């Protein structure tokens, strides 16, 4: 939590064009205190958090790395809540099988499912014997993940978080993500992916899927609040210093919204090799 808070204070301050001195003046404290917050040496007093959040133009929840409350539910919050059963079904992605072959659970390995949706892949990993954590911005998605895990007789540490605000503090053997990178604000990509890479254990795996833009493919019909597809091949370059087990680009048909459309995607399996 300390690392997340430190990064958020620094980021939101810079987004406002404030110096450490400027923020300190707003709070009637010394700039040295702000500097210590941003380096993680100390944390703000709890009583000061509301004033700090106000000065930075965010909620206390967002400052602490939790998703802020939304007046308008996200597209998938509504989809998951109103689905008859599970919006994406309960059959795991083929990517799960590839991960299983690359790093089987011969010992208790830790997995983080980033943007887990309704939990079908997270629950699959738990059933295979992995120690699984998973997060999503959708309340309904998190609750359905927990329900699916209960039904399968396994445990998934499912929690709510916003991919743009949440930063890893624990280390994992496998980072897994399908179709969520497009929600990362472009100006935050470098920082977020660097944070992810720094929290993968040696010999660990990153298994990532990202939508990419193509001039010959129309934008998807889903009205997502944040949709920032990557450039073709961009995902691979973030892991140029890891061993690339496999990477590919493909185009596929989709009818998730009830309207037939196509997507282009890049898929990456990279191993942290020291």
Predicted regions and their residues:
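Class I (Rossmann-like) S-adenosyl-L-methionine-dependent methyltransferase catalytic domain
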Residues: 67-107, 111-170, 184-191, 195, ...
């Amino acid at each position: 939590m300390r690392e997340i808070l430190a990064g958020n204070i620094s980021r939101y301050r810079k987004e406002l064009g404030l110096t450490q001195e400027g923020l300190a003046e707003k709070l009637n404290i010394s700039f040295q205190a702000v500097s210590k917050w941003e380096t993680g040496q100390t944390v703000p007093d709890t009583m000061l958090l509301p004033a700090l959040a106000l000065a930075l133009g965010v909620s206390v929840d967002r400052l602490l790395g939790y998703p802020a409350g939304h007046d308008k539910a996200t597209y998938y919050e509504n989809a998951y809540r109103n689905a008859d059963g599970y919006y994406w079904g309960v059959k795991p992605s083929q990517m799960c099988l590839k991960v299983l072959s690359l790093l089987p659970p011969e010992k208790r390995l830790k997995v983080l499912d980033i943007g887990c949706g309704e939990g079908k892949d997270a629950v699959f990993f738990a059933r295979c014997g992995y120690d699984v954590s998973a997060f999503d911005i959708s309340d309904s998605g998190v609750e359905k993940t927990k329900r699916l895990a209960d039904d399968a007789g396994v445990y998934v540490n499912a929690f709510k978080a916003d991919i743009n605000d949440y930063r890893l503090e624990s280390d994992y053997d496998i980072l897994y993500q399908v179709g969520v990178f497009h929600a990362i604000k472009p100006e935050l990509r470098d920082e977020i992916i660097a944070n992810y890479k720094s929290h993968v254990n040696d010999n660990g795996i990153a298994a990532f899927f990202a939508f990419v833009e193509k001039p010959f493919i129309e934008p998807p019909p889903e009205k997502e609040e944040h949709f920032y597809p990557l450039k073709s091949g961009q995902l691979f370059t973030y892991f140029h210093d890891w061993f690339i087990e496999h990477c590919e680009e493909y185009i596929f048909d989709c009818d998730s919204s009830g309207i037939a459309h196509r997507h282009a995607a890049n898929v990456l399996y990279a191993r942290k090799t020291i």
